Amino acid sequence: MAKTIQAIRGMNDCSPTESLLWQWVEEKVRSVLQTYGYSEVRMPIVESTPLFARAIGEVTDVVSKEMYTFWDNDEQLTLRPEGTAGCVRAAIEHGWIYNNEQRLWYMGPMFRHERPQKGRYRQFHQAGVEVFGIANPEIDAELILLTARLWKQLGIFDHVTLQLNSIGSLESRQNYRSALVEFLQQHTDLLSEEEKERLVKNPLRILDTKNQVLQEVLNDAPKLLDYLDQESREHFSQLCDLLDAVGIQYEINPKLVRGLDYYNKTVFEWVTSALGAQGTVCGGGRYDGLVEQLGGHATCSVGFAMGLERLVLLVQEVNKQIVLPSAVDIYVVYFGEKTTLPAFQLAEKIRTELPHLRTMTHCGGGNFKKQFKRADKVGAKFALVIGETEVKTQQVVVKDLLGGAEQLSLALTDVVIYLKQAITQ
């Protein structure tokens, strides 16, 4: 027997049963985004490597350690580790945002070479939102309201907490960086080798260290909010006032900086304690300088991304009321001479007149017992039975597989009407 080939570590398959939950979550995401008037865009999963180096920052963990990069002839390419850079690139290239506001969203796979664990994978999926051309804090608040509405739709709102911070302008971060480095240099004995490297290259990333002893020390470190420029301070204050006015609770987390270099002013995360170490289910903020940094005209921007794997895990963990649709509504069973054609014609008629129902024709041969067993296995609600007698009498036997009404015989012409009433009840 030939040796089997397995999926790459950290890149997972999704079974038919698991896909039902994924589809349910994705449909909720799409529905909420459409409610707010956002437009879908689609970008390639492979981009030029310099795009991410320029956008995310060469000293970030994502660019320096985690990207899947390869050479194609003389061009260096990368599987996208996140969606914002590619969306900005596309918006500049196609003129979507020149003198124009845009509210865009996308959904798809991303890739990072990380140590796989629950909620963190090498291929993972994100839904992302990017808004261009709106500078005021109202749009920051709208994105947070949008996500809050989605959490309610998913049944997870009571299990997530909103954390907010402002990281100000580049100048204010540089001033804060100097103060933070001066503080941390007094505690270098507590820093790991990786953290010592960050102290030189990207000291703000030390603020989200998992080292509990260092976290305690950082409670006494200078606070970024104390170094904000006046514009960023006013922007953040107005955002907090807006959230207070609409009843969105939040925590101000002075250590929240996000892991990508393009952010400025507002940053936020929705976190949960229900998934262990991988507690962030959504994160984002403003990146007002990124469009210009990538060659476009100066354009204020804000966005977020949510991890779909973590959302699916969280829904499984806390939403016990969810009722997923079955993969099949109607299963057409047929056995005997001259039953195949009527069965196929009936199935096609149902698909034409009731396209919202999922209709499966058996196709596998075997007696009625075998076919009913298969209908039960796929979770069908109704079986439509056509035997030799039904062919002669132009009737169909309808069997409720979920234990409701007893089976009954209907004229072939009445089946669609019956199903329309029975399945919408």
UniProtKB/Swiss-Prot annotation:
Recorded GO CC terms: cytoplasm
Family classification: Belongs to the class-II aminoacyl-tRNA synthetase family.
Pfam families in UniProt: HGTP_anticodon, tRNA-synt_His
Main subcellular location: cytoplasm
Biological process, per Gene Ontology: histidyl-tRNA aminoacylation
PANTHER family: HISTIDINE--TRNA LIGASE, MITOCHONDRIAL-RELATED, HISTIDYL-TRNA SYNTHETASE
Gene3D superfamilies: Anticodon-binding domain, Bira Bifunctional Protein, Domain 2
Molecular function per GO: ATP binding; histidine-tRNA ligase activity
Assembly: Homodimer.
Location of the protein in the cell: Cytoplasm
Chemical reaction(s) catalysed: tRNA(His) + L-histidine + ATP = L-histidyl-tRNA(His) + AMP + diphosphate + H(+)
InterPro entries in alphabetical order: aa-tRNA-synth_II, aa-tRNA-synth_II/BPL/LPL, Anticodon-bd, Anticodon-bd_dom_sf, His-tRNA-ligase, HisRS-like_core, HisRS/HisZ, HisRS_anticodon
Matches recorded under CDD domains: HisRS-like_core (cd00773), HisRS_anticodon (cd00859)
Record's protein name: Histidine--tRNA ligase
